[in-house]
């Protein structure tokens, strides 16, 4: 049996749960319970704060978990965890920012003794030390952007996705500390246990199959027999397209193929020009 730690709230909680459900690992949640069953009796779920998950997995409280790379760095656990997968979403950057009217325009302008407010004191301190800087770190638990304007700090170190929030709060980015995405991580001892490792790999395989399918589409059509070679040349598919007879029409063939989502528009246009008809483009839930 393995215990999977998932964020109990926040921007990555919903998409992660949706991916697990598409992978076939439906979670039975009852009210505000901190633990839940899945359709697999050998996989149980624990809901926790995303910031606590790196330590829970490192310490063996959970066997595998989902968290942000920034939180792994903040808890200084990245070397102690087995990094299994980058979800490629939940993108954010931890940046140092200053008020727009500040004389600080880059990390070179930051001076020892300045105050910096952040929700990431550990990561911020280590980064500044690598830069040879000694700042007073003010730990906050939210609304970091206001700190320079109420005399709490000179700078902030905070997460940003697009930079819009910084601009709205009259702040400018002066240094990028780290880029972060959502990660699947495992306890190293659990990965050495054959039974637990096998179950963790099942979870990993399921997630990978959903993520891979998100960028693909199944395209189906009826096409003239004399155009099949031209059509199959523009939809190679995965191992080649599937071509089959249509019982009611001996001049047409049914063709199915998997293509990249970003090629759908161009491909459909080309197929129509070659005489394909009854074209269907369908989302795919999983590809194994």
Curated annotation (Swiss-Prot):
Cofactor(s) needed by this chain: Mg(2+)
Keywords (A to Z) from UniProt: Amino-acid biosynthesis, ATP-binding, Cytoplasm, Glycosyltransferase, Histidine biosynthesis, Magnesium, Metal-binding, Nucleotide-binding, Transferase
Root EC class: transferase
Description of activity control: Feedback inhibited by histidine.
Catalytic activity, reaction form: 1-(5-phospho-beta-D-ribosyl)-ATP + diphosphate = 5-phospho-alpha-D-ribose 1-diphosphate + ATP
One MF term in the entry's GO annotations: ATP binding
GO BP: L-histidine biosynthetic process
Localization: Cytoplasm
Protein's UniProt keywords contain Ribosomal protein: no
CC annotations in GO: cytoplasm
Annotated S-S bridges: none
Pathway connected to this protein: Amino-acid biosynthesis; L-histidine biosynthesis; L-histidine from 5-phospho-alpha-D-ribose 1-diphosphate: step 1/9
Family: Belongs to the ATP phosphoribosyltransferase family. Long subfamily.
Described function: Catalyzes the condensation of ATP and 5-phosphoribose 1-diphosphate to form N'-(5'-phosphoribosyl)-ATP (PR-ATP). Has a crucial role in the pathway because the rate of histidine biosynthesis seems to be controlled primarily by regulation of HisG enzymatic activity.
Protein name, as recorded: ATP phosphoribosyltransferase
Gene that produces this protein: hisG
């Amino acid at each position: 049996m393995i215990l999977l730690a998932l964020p109990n709230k926040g921007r990555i909680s919903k998409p992660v749960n949706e991916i697990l459900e598409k992978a076939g690992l439906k979670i039975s949640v009852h009210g505000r319970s901190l633990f839940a069953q899945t359709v697999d009796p050998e996989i149980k779920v624990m809901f926790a704060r995303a910031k606590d998950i790196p330590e829970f997995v490192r310490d063996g409280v959970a066997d595998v978990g989902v968290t942000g790379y920034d939180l792994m760095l903040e808890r200084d656990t990245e070397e102690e965890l087995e990094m299994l997968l980058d979800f490629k979403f939940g993108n954010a950057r931890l940046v140092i920012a200053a008020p727009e009217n500040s004389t600080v325009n880059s990390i070179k302008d930051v001076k020892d003794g300045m105050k910096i407010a952040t929700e990431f004191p550990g990561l911020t301190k280590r980064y500044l030390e690598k830069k040879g800087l000694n700042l007073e770190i003010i730990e906050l638990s939210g609304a970091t952007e206001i700190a320079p304007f109420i005399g709490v700090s000179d700078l902030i170190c905070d997460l940003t996705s697009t930079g819009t929030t910084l601009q709205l709060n009259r702040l400018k980015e002066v240094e990028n500390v780290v880029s972060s995405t959502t990660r699947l991580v495992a306890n190293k001892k659990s990965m050495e246990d054959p039974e637990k490792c096998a179950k963790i790999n099942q979870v990993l395989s399921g997630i990978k199959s959903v993520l891979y399918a998100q960028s693909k589409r199944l395209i189906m059509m009826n096409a003239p027999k004399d155009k099949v070679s031209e059509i199959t040349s523009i939809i190679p598919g995965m191992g080649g397209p599937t071509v089959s007879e249509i019982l009611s029409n001996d001049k047409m063939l049914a063709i199915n193929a998997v293509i990249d989502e970003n090629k759908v528009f161009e491909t459909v246009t080309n197929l129509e020009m070659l005489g394909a008809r009854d074209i269907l483009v369908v989302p795919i839930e999983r590809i194994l």
